[in-house]
């Protein structure tokens, strides 16, 4: 498996040899930031196109097929259209909060995105409390959503924001308990160590039944945190027009739209990292030839392949199940998922204490 830290170390040494170390670090930070923004934009375009095609498939139609080959540049045209849209200033809104909200949502998404271990040696933020930082950074987004609902001075926006706040805060508990269950098995919160410790088997298989239960609960709760169907009550168009982004237009609306898809990818990427081995290839005990071939596939291909597989599962859920009521959503969390997650955590602790895992 190729280690990208060799390249990054060489770049750092080259820069520090021709300029002061502080300036070199500043240039590296700028380049990393530009790369994250570029990857963020590319992933958003791919995910939106994938969503439209998957939606078309489940509804027995073609999806976008006019602009470009197989509709491949339809999303780019939509981006250009959105860039030319006017950002409307509301007369009686709280302008500061109204304008701040989209940036808080997108910044929370960026911070969380920067934690993802794309390949060996290719992590922007890799420290010993990475899982804790990811959970903390992802919680910032709910503040932006609440500000959007309040600052818009619109009853539909406020109701949508309150629904979203209740939903995200509730389901964060199940996400946290599911990840904590796996942290007990993993013994670390550093993402690079989490992936490397799965070289001899992915945690979804090593943790017995509790790991599978944690994976299912994580997918359900992660889907709800992203406000994706069937948990899309905050933007239920039949009753709230567009929820908390009703009054937004132009790139302000675009930021919310981007954040939704990238948050879905982050949920999928974290699932791929913690449960499915991240950038670690598939190894089967006793099949040395097969394992050697798998090692030739670059780590980032494994990472994105697993992440997009989980994204497909999330899209499948959205376009299969009908929308739930807000009371059903909260009942599912507090009466079922939280108790099951807590019992599951205790079972995992017992498995680890008595050494019953693989």
From Swiss-Prot:
Q: Name one GO molecular function term.
A: NADH dehydrogenase activity
Q: Which gene encodes it?
A: nuoH
Q: What is any one GO biological process for this UniProt entry?
A: aerobic respiration
Q: List the Pfam families hit by this protein, alphabetically.
A: NADHdh
Q: What is its main location?
A: membrane
Catalytic reaction equation(s): a quinone + NADH + 5 H(+)(in) = a quinol + NAD(+) + 4 H(+)(out)
Report one GO cellular component.
plasma membrane
Q: Which UniProt keywords apply?
A: Cell inner membrane, Cell membrane, Membrane, NAD, Quinone, Translocase, Transmembrane, Transmembrane helix, Ubiquinone
Broad EC category: translocase
Q: What sections of the sequence does the record tag as coiled-coil?
A: none
Sequence similarity = Belongs to the complex I subunit 1 family.
Question: What's the Enzyme Commission number for this chain?
Answer: 7.1.1.-
Q: Does the keyword Transport apply?
A: no
HAMAP family, alphabetized:
NDH1_NuoH
Q: How does it assemble?
A: NDH-1 is composed of 14 different subunits. Subunits NuoA, H, J, K, L, M, N constitute the membrane sector of the complex.
Q: Where are the transmembrane segments?
A: 30-50, 96-116, 129-149, 168-188, 201-221, 265-285, 297-317, 336-356
Recorded protein name is NADH-quinone oxidoreductase subunit H
Topology versus the membrane, per the UniProt entry? Multi-pass membrane protein
The function of this protein is: NDH-1 shuttles electrons from NADH, via FMN and iron-sulfur (Fe-S) centers, to quinones in the respiratory chain. The immediate electron acceptor for the enzyme in this species is believed to be ubiquinone. Couples the redox reaction to proton translocation (for every two electrons transferred, four hydrogen ions are translocated across the cytoplasmic membrane), and thus conserves the redox energy in a proton gradient. This subunit may bind ubiquinone.
InterPro entries according to UniProt: NADH_UbQ_OxRdtase_su1/FPO, NADH_UbQ_OxRdtase_su1_CS
List locations, semicolon-separated: Cell inner membrane
């Amino acid at each position: 498996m190729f280690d990208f830290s060799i390249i990054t170390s060489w770049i750092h040494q080259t820069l520090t040899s021709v300029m002061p170390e502080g300036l070199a670090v500043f240039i590296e930070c700028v380049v990393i930031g530009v790369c994250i923004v570029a990857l963020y934009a590319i992933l958003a375009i791919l995910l939106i196109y994938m969503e439209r095609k998957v939606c078309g498939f489940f509804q027995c139609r073609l999806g976008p097929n006019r602009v470009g080959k197989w509709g491949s540049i339809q999303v780019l045209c939509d981006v250009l259209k959105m860039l030319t849209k006017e950002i409307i200033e509301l007369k009686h809104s709280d302008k500061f909060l109204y304008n701040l909200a989209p940036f808080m949502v997108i910044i929370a998404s960026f911070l969380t995105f920067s934690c993802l271990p794309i390949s060996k040696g290719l992590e922007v933020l890799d420290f010993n409390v990475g899982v804790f930082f990811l959970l903390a950074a992802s919680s910032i987004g709910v503040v932006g959503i609440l500000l959007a609902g309040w600052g818009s001075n619109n009853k539909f926006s406020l109701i949508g924001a309150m629904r979203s706040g209740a939903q995200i805060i509730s389901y964060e508990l199940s996400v946290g308990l599911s990840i904590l269950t796996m942290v007990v098995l993993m013994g670390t919160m550093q993402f690079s160590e989490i992936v490397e410790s799965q070289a001899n088997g992915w945690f979804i298989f090593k943790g017995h039944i509790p790991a599978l239960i944690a994976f299912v609960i994580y997918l359900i709760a992660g889907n709800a945190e992203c406000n994706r169907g069937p948990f899309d009550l905050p933007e239920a168009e039949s009753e709230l027009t567009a929820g908390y982004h009703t009054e937004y237009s132009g790139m302000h609306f675009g930021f919310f739209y981007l954040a939704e898809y990238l948050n879905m990818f982050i949920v999928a990427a974290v699932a791929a990292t913690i449960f499915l081995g991240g950038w670690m290839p598939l190894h089967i005990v006793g099949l040395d030839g097969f394992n050697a071939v798998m090692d030739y596939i670059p780590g980032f291909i494994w990472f994105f392949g697993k992440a997009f597989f989980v994204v497909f599962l999330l899209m499948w859920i959205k376009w299969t199940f009908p929308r739930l009521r807000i009371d059903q959503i909260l009942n599912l969390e507090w009466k079922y998922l939280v108790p099951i997650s807590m019992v599951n955590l205790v079972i995992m602790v017992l498995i680890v204490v008595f050494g019953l895992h693989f």
